[in-house]
Amino acid sequence: MKETIVAQATAPGRGGIGILRVSGPLATEVAQAILGKCPKPRMADYLPFKDADGTILDQGIALYFKSPNSFTGEDVLELQGHGGQVVLDLLLKRILQIDGIRLARPGEFSEQAFLNDKFDLAQAEAIADLIDATSEQAARSALKSLQGEFSKKVNELVDSVIYLRTYVEASIDFPDEEIDFLADGKIEANLRSIINQLEDVRAEAKQGSILREGMKVVIAGRPNAGKSSLLNALAGREAAIVTDIAGTTRDVLREHIHIDGMPLHIIDTAGLRDATDEVERIGISRAWTEIEQADRIILMLDSSDPESVDLSKVRSEFLAKLPSTLPVTIVRNKIDLNGEQASESEQSGYQMISLSAQTHDGVKLLREHLKQAMGFQTGMEGGFLARRRHLDALDKAAEHLQIGLVQLTEFHAGELLAEELRLVQSYLSEITGQFTSDDLLGNIFSSFCIGK
């Protein structure tokens, strides 16, 4: 028999309204015990909520949803009372006294809904993402995921892969046919079409991941290059202390900002040099740790100092020490001191922006550059949020499609192509939960609120 669970569905603490949710086959029994009757399905009823001895604990609205026409797909009872935590705790305690009722685990209501096919795994995750959204665009994209925008794209890919698998396996099972299916070009054309289709979804998912998680951008450079001034300019407030004394910043400073809905984690670090002071050395060590973990580096140069902007020295002192895959944007700061105009250019393979963090001249250029560098498009229609596990699954699917293409075009190996397509289907299906381990489900739903 399925279990019946209960939890507070509203946030803990004081509020105008507090809601308890009961889900499972004993929901009607809870209604009889607390309300003296079970409300008609989907009809609000204003009733007293009673303790075991008949004492009225609260009064409010009771709603009953009969399976399968509920959020979880089970019988659901919602008690909407006053939002005092003491009152809600008393009512919750009373419900838990009823045999067969237990407190819900975090995310268990959503887990019930997923297991009852009310939505798929990507949609379930979108519930948590909608709650946690930190910007209007992130909230809109989470809602699109909840409505199935992401799942629809993934399911279309899965359908295309299944169709191609069927065609490939037919060519293997019927080798005596006069037509060589592997060589007639149709399979290769379909395979390349799926690869292109997947690339479009990956690009959109990458933007969705940016919206959800943000990008970590570290500002680095020599002391007194204007790193803290740039942090303040991007943050729009005096987040960091700025002086003419080199080495003022000795620890890591973090600011969370939004650029047209794109979340950025901006990190100001200690100036990089050979320090003799122990505290400054610790700060520089922490700076390098942040640099190694960054998604992008903003390398600050002092344009008023000819030695500072010598790219050959910059390359040996700094750029050569970075991971080769780490993207770098070079910023020539302090153009207000030499009369330069704000500009954007490319030098030696690096994007370079000339600006003044002091006067903010050119800061807008940097903001636009960061948006473009992250692959972010303002106001993108049909966007959805994506998690790291979604990107990983899409990346693995893309990798096996490319392997399959090689097996087809270079080795004419139908059996190996069929196996690669099977793996692609498996990775894509992990996103929506069609093929998902119990451990993964546990990790996902345990991150939800208790009442979700």
Swiss-Prot record:
Location in or out of the cell: Cytoplasm
A single GO molecular function term of this UniProt record: GTPase activity
Gene3D superfamilies, alphabetized: P-loop containing nucleotide triphosphate hydrolases, Probable tRNA modification gtpase trme, domain 1, tRNA modification GTPase MnmE domain 2
CC terms in the record's Gene Ontology section: cytosol
UniProt-listed GO biological process terms: tRNA methylation; tRNA wobble uridine modification
Main location: cytoplasm
Positions annotated to bind Mg(2+): S228, T249
Binding site for K(+): N224, T243, I245, T248
Positions with a binding annotation for GTP: 224-229, 243-249, 268-271
Cofactor: K(+)
Domain TrmE-type G: 214-375
Keyword Lipoprotein found: no
Domain of life from the UniProt record: Bacteria
Keyword presence, Hydrolase: yes
Binding note for cofactor: Binds 1 potassium ion per subunit.
Positions contributing to (6S)-5-formyl-5,6,7,8-tetrahydrofolate binding: R21, E78, K118, K452
PANTHER family: TRNA MODIFICATION GTPASE GTPBP3 (PTHR42714), TRNA MODIFICATION GTPASE GTPBP3, MITOCHONDRIAL (PTHR42714:SF2)
Subunit structure: Homodimer. Heterotetramer of two MnmE and two MnmG subunits.
Family indicated by similarity: Belongs to the TRAFAC class TrmE-Era-EngA-EngB-Septin-like GTPase superfamily. TrmE GTPase family.
Protein name: tRNA modification GTPase MnmE
Encoding gene per record: mnmE
